[in-house]
């Protein structure tokens, strides 16, 4: 076993190898605090026939890592949760560009989180572990790389902040890089400036270099020879001939504004060229197909670099035409149809109650994690005119949805001010690049349409890069073709005041911060243009919620009244819900949330809650219901759960022989609360609300009257039933 330990970001960080998973091609354990991850990598001995590099990354959080047992009926880990898929994507996107071009042996990277201290996140540790395991194996890999998380707490930059620190941070970025450049960025923020993002990247790169130094020191002791492999190369004569015949024709085919016209023209041209070339080279069909693809790749790139114009005729910094429709779905709480060029998203916002929040088990928290905001992104095959199998939500859909969700998260109102669970669904109806950013724009508009008081509108734009040596071009609002044949996909979302979400993937070994600085500046200009177009359609949240959305109000009740509100076996709260149609939820701190479609039922439910939990006030008049009639009076419910004695002598100024001559069970009576004794028992009076007949002598209040010997007693001697406050609780 080999091991290295250093202090990183104020805590011990350990990398070790040779103790676990020794039959894998390479393995490593990384520990930070008491969080530990195991990475194990394997490789196929033979090249895959697939036209792409078959890399698989699996990231799994073991519940035993936090001393937990999985919830549900089946007590074992199942399919990956969203956050595990997102962590796997971060690792995949960071390491994929660093495998040699042409290497197509299948590689699998497995990450297990085997200890979780609920302070330090494991995803950046997993990136370090994967890098070390690959470098310590026979797999060719142009590393090492490392990843860090950066936050800013009260103006101070923090590397690998704890979960508690992240709760106070206005920025959270995961950054991966090599010694010389950045290879991946992912994160969100609260409207921070481009300058702040760049500063965080510089700080992150310093931490990355430190972690790479640790890896290199340990790799010097354990590195093994790399496996031999041969890059498939076409014969030189075929390569030259394909370039001669294809370059001009493919460039001409590429220059079509419409996506499908372009694709059809390029494919038709390639087919015609291939048929002619096969006459000359009948045994090299595969080489000819690959070389024609290479020509397409180089022609698109050289056109942009040579002419500064793109295949659809736009300039480098030009955004496609935008059209926006809002309120397109009459029953949805908020909706928008956002179209940019040939990319279109139908986005709907739904408002729900706290009961609609998502509750998740997590090894990062002692208890459940609750999500009251969700954005779900769907990318059906018809959006690109394709036919493909549907196998549930893809990793790409989860990743794009998370990016768009994070873009909007920072501008939502506080839950205390707007106590709704919010779900946004973005259905991509057409796609020709940047559908996730269309989802951001459509999501912001749908929330405005729903009347959600966002702090500001949010827009997003996808930036691209074409780089050949020292020449490069940064492209705004990239097409699908530019994404496929370019070197970078850099998505930036935010408001007019700052960035709220960012994601960068590259296909080359890395980018220096100078290019990223230019890309951020150009992205800001594009974002402001898009925000201007959105303002023309809907500049602010609508003043009222949809008539189909629930109205929610919160009231605070004393904690000791929670039991009375709920009632025996939930009787009281169910009664309110059944009578009003409202939905009630009660928190442990006495916060009661009332939700109803329609203001009348909500107000009625609110009054009933306040009636149950309010304290009767001596001297106030109440409308009550006679619950019981006895020989000495009646018991009247003046508030739900609060019954008080209406003594026979308090029914009329004149003498009443039989209480049932005045009131009957079920009667609604108006009474005045005249007394509450030291034991909390309540006494009512009807006659106090009636004019006193002339000449009638004053009587002492009942509390001062002597006990009678005819069996008639004051209500307080009935064991407390007549005067108790909160009788509903005593009955349970």
Swiss-Prot record:
It comes from the Bacteria. It catalyses: RNA(n+1) + phosphate = RNA(n) + a ribonucleoside 5'-diphosphate. Its EC number is 2.7.7.8. Residues 550-609 form the KH domain. Keywords: Cytoplasm, Magnesium, Metal-binding, Nucleotidyltransferase, RNA-binding, Transferase. It is an enzyme of class 2 (transferase). Residues 619-687 form the S1 motif domain. It is found in: Cytoplasm. Mg(2+) binds at residues 483, 489. Involved in mRNA degradation. Catalyzes the phosphorolysis of single-stranded polyribonucleotides processively in the 3'- to 5'-direction. This is Polyribonucleotide nucleotidyltransferase. It comes from Gemmatimonas aurantiaca (strain DSM 14586 / JCM 11422 / NBRC 100505 / T-27).
């Amino acid at each position: 076993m080999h091991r290295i330990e250093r202090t990183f970001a104020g805590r011990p960080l350990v990398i070790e190898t040779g103790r676990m998973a020794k039959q894998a091609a390479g393995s490593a354990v990384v520990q930070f605090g008491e969080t530990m991850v195991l990475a194990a990598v394997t490789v196929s001995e033979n090249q895959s026939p697939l036209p792409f590099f078959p890399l698989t990354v699996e990231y799994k959080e073991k519940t035993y890592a936090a001393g937990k047992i999985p919830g549900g009926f089946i007590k074992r880990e199942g399919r990956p949760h969203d956050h595990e898929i997102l962590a796997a994507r971060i690792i995949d996107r960071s390491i994929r560009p660093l495998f040699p071009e042409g290497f197509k042996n299948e590689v699998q990277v497995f990450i297990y989180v085997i200890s979780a201290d609920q302070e330090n996140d494991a995803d950046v540790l997993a990136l370090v572990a994967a890098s070390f395991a690959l470098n310590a194996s026979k797999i060719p890999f142009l590393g090492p790389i490392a990843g860090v998380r950066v936050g800013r707490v009260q103006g101070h930059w923090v590397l690998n902040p704890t979960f508690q620190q992240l709760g106070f941070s206005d920025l959270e970025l995961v950054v991966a890089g090599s010694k010389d450049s950045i290879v991946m960025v992912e994160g969100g923020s609260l409207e921070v400036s481009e300058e702040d993002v760049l500063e965080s990247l510089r700080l992150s790169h310093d931490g990355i270099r430190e972690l790479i130094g640790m890896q290199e020191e340990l790799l010097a002791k354990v590195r093994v020879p790399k496996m031999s492999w041969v890059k498939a190369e076409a014969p030189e004569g075929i390569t030259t001939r394909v370039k001669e015949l294809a370059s001009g024709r493919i460039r001409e085919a590429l220059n079509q504004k419409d996506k499908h016209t372009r694709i059809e023209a390029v494919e038709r041209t390639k087919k015609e060229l291939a048929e002619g070339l096969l006459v000359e080279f009948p045994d090299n069909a595969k080489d000819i197909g690959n070389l024609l693809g290479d020509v397409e790749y180089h022609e698109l790139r050289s056109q942009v670099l040579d002419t500064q114009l793109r295949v659809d005729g736009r300039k480098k910094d030009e955004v496609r035409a935008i059209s926006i429709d809002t309120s397109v779905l009459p029953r949805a709480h908020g909706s928008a149809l956002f179209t940019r060029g040939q990319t279109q998203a139908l986005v709907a916002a739904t408002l729900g109650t706290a009961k609609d929040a998502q509750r998740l088990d997590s090894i990062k928290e002692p208890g459940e994690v609750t999500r009251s905001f969700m954005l779900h992104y769907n990318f059906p095959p018809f959006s690109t005119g394709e036919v493909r199998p549907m196998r549930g939500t893809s990793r790409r859909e989860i990743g794009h949805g998370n990016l768009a969700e994070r873009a909007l998260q920072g501008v939502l109102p506080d839950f205390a001010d707007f106590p709704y669970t919010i779900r946004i669904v973005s259905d991509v109806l057409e796609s020709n690049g940047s559908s996730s950013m269309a989802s951001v724009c459509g999501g912001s508009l749908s929330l405005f349409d729903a009347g959600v008081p966002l702090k500001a509108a949010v827009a997003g734009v996808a930036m691209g890069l074409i780089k050949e040596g020292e020449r490069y071009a940064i492209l705004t609002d990239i097409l699908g073709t530019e994404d496929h044949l370019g070197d970078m996909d850099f998505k930036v979302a935010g408001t007019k005041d700052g960035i709220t979400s960012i994601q960068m993937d590259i296909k080359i070994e890395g980018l220096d911060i100078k290019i990223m600085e230019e890309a951020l500046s150009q992205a800001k200009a594009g974002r402001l243009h898009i925000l201007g177009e959105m303002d023309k359609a809907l500049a602010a949240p609508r003043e009222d919620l949809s008539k189909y959305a629930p109205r929610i109000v919160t009231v605070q009740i004393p904690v000791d009244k929670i039991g009375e509100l709920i009632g025996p076996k939930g009787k009281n709260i169910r009664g309110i819900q059944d009578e009003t149609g409202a939905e009630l939820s009660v928190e442990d701190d006495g916060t009661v949330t009332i939700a109803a479609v329609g203001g009348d039922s909500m107000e009625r439910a609110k009054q009933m809650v306040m009636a149950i939990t309010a304290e009767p006030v001596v001297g106030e008049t109440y409308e009550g219901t006679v619950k019981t009639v006895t020989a000495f009076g009646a018991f009247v419910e003046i508030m739900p759960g609060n019954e008080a004695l209406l003594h026979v002598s308090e029914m009329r100024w004149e003498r009443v022989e039989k209480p049932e001559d005045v009131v009957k069970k079920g009667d609604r009576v108006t009474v005045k609360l005249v007394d509450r004794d030291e034991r909390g028992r309540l006494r009512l009076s009807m006659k106090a609300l009636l004019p006193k007949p002339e000449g009638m002598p004053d009587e002492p209040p009942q509390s001062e009257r002597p006990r009678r010997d005819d069996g008639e007693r004051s209500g307080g001697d009935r064991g407390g039933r007549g005067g108790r406050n909160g009788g509903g609780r005593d009955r349970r």
